[in-house]
């Protein structure tokens, strides 16, 4: 029996929502995350300090990268979207009966139209989100830069009040930043974003740069980091002594970062209306499925609140490398049998292997 906070679930998601995730959103997430991880890893494997600095970011990215690929595989194998499609066809027939049509008649059409309208946006937003998650130069110049602009516009008294918070933010931002790594990650992510998300429409400045560089941002990023104040903590601190708004607004990394952040936050009136229409239709779908008894799910999705779960703990699939009597825990023998030199998950220290061979367990 487990008491805990399970995060969120989407068991009521419609068929086309699942299709959108499997074909548009999650593949973009997986590729974007892998691009960030690969370029982080190039530097992490060469320097123990960098490895420590980026371990948390890498692990967090890898966690969701595995999750999204696992979701693609599982949903495809289980044919979940096809099952939902059949269920929704039955619901649509029920919804268009005379006694139900006024309330439920347009629910499926509204939902399907929404996903058709947002498939490309889902792909675009996931590529851009992974850029922003893995590339500090994608977010920091805009977030910190806007604070510096506000600082520059104030009088001396107000600046003195703002200074401690800004200094603290700068210390936090640059405490574990490794500039060569960040340059590589931003370059790779801009190349990927410009290549894969263009069908929906890129951030305007990025689209302008792509037209001039044929999709290779290597030189653009090199020029930007060479002349930007945001690649150096000392340069940002120096700005605080002589603050000028134009120093930030003309900074090349700020221009790119602000362009990306503006794009991910943008929402047109048409998109707002589509979101509102979908929200209403989805609530009606859930209500109608429960009323019609066409769905076996009779409980709400998890919403990050405390839940109780109970049942049996099943063992993992049998593995001849694991000598555990029940395959739900790991032994030293199992670890050694799974040992792979140089592998990120299954490498082991040479000293541990020696101690195990000598049966020296302390």
Give residue ranges: language-model regions:
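Terminal presequence/propeptide segments associated with secretion/organelle targeting
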Residues: 1-362
């Amino acid at each position: 029996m487990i008491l805990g906070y399970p995060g969120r679930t989407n068991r009521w998601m419609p068929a086309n929502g699942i299709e959108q995730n499997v074909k548009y959103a999650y593949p973009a997430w997986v590729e974007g995350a892998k691009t960030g991880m690969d370029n982080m890893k190039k530097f992490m494997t060469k320097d123990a300090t960098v490895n420590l600095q980026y371990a948390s970011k890498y692990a967090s990215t890898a966690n969701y990268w595995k999750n999204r690929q696992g979701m693609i595989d599982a949903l495809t194998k289980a044919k979940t979207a096809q099952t939902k499609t059949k269920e929704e066809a039955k619901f649509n027939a029920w919804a268009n009966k005379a006694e139900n049509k006024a309330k439920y008649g347009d629910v499926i059409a509204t939902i399907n139209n929404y996903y058709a309208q947002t498939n490309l946006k889902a792909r675009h937003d996931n590529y851009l989100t992974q850029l922003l998650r893995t590339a500090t130069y994608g977010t920091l110049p805009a977030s910190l830069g806007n604070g510096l602009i506000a600082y520059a516009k104030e009088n001396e008294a107000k600046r003195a009040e703002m200074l401690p918070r800004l200094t603290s933010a700068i210390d936090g931002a640059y405490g574990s930043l490794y500039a060569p790594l960040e340059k590589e990650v931003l370059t790779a992510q801009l190349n990927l974003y410009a290549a894969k998300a263009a069908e929906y429409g890129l951030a305007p400045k990025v689209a302008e740069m792509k037209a001039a560089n044929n999709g290779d941002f290597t030189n653009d990023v090199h020029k930007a980091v060479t002349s930007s104040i945001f690649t150096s903590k000392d340069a940002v601190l120096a700005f605080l002594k002589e603050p000028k708004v134009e120093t930030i607004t003309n900074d090349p990394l700020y221009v790119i970062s602000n362009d990306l952040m503006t794009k991910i936050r943008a929402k047109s009136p048409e998109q707002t209306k589509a979101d509102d229409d979908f929200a209403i239709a989805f609530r009606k779908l859930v209500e109608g499925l429960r009323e019609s008894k066409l769905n076996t799910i009779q409980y709400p999705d998890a919403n990050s609140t405390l839940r109780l779960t109970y049942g049996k703990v099943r063992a993992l699939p049998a593995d001849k490398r694991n000598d555990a009597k029940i395959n739900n825990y790991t032994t030293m023998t199992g670890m050694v049998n799974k040992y792979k030199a140089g592998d990120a998950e299954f490498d082991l220290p040479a000293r541990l292997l020696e101690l195990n061979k000598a049966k020296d367990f302390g």
